Amino acid sequence: MHFPLPIKAVMIDLDGTLLDTAPDLATAANMMLKELGKAELPLETIQSYIGKGIEKLVKRSLTGDLDGEPDSDLLRRAMPLYERSYEKTLYVDTRAYPGVREGLNALRAGGFRLACVTNKAEAFTLPLLRAAELLDYFDIVVSGDSLPKKKPDPMPLLHACERFEIQPHDMLLVGDSLNDAQAARAAGSHVFCVPYGYNEGRDVYELDCDAIVPSLYEATKLIQKSS
């Protein structure tokens, strides 16, 4: 593969790529656990549960297992508790990672179309991007409940390509996890990964991606706008 890659549009993951949301997600999870009379969990543990949407995060927090399935009645009680808690903690300790704003500015200046593609529900995605003053950078936002399927399924990426009227090979996804790598490969798109995100506790260097980039800004140096 030769760099810089010719690209028309860039899609960027949210949690663990644009924003370090783990502190606020963890606070909400522990508020939920406390209300349910359960022991609170360390930040590092909850951080490893992030990546497949809020329902999965709640299930993992309740069971202590990445693939755990709690009692259906418990889950039914827990979900609204978590959602109410996260509404309160949404943008308390969440911050953009170094190089994010510089990268977004460089991409905009370079003429790239931009999409945020996340597994987070729209009810939290849009307020969070707005609070972080990032929403206006994006032409489109595809949330975890925007479509019938979410990452690692390629549907959100293919949907964004259709909206941009481009082919998947003209698109780059920047993410932090196996979800992102698998979705991009299934869509036929390029993918860069950042090493500072969550990836459900796994080593990002084991992922099938085209490059590991230390920041979104550094990613901009490996692509060029194609006509």
UniProtKB/Swiss-Prot annotation:
EC numbers for this chain: 3.1.3.18
Catalytic activity field: 2-phosphoglycolate + H2O = glycolate + phosphate
GO biological process: carbohydrate metabolic process; DNA repair; glycolate biosynthetic process
Pfam families: HAD_2 (PF13419)
Pathway this chain belongs to: Organic acid metabolism; glycolate biosynthesis; glycolate from 2-phosphoglycolate: step 1/1
Sequence positions that bind Mg(2+): D13, D15, D176
HAMAP family according to UniProt: GPH_hydrolase_bact
Function: Specifically catalyzes the dephosphorylation of 2-phosphoglycolate. Is involved in the dissimilation of the intracellular 2-phosphoglycolate formed during the DNA repair of 3'-phosphoglycolate ends, a major class of DNA lesions induced by oxidative stress.
Name of the featured protein: Phosphoglycolate phosphatase
Source organism (scientific name): Nitrosospira multiformis (strain ATCC 25196 / NCIMB 11849 / C 71)
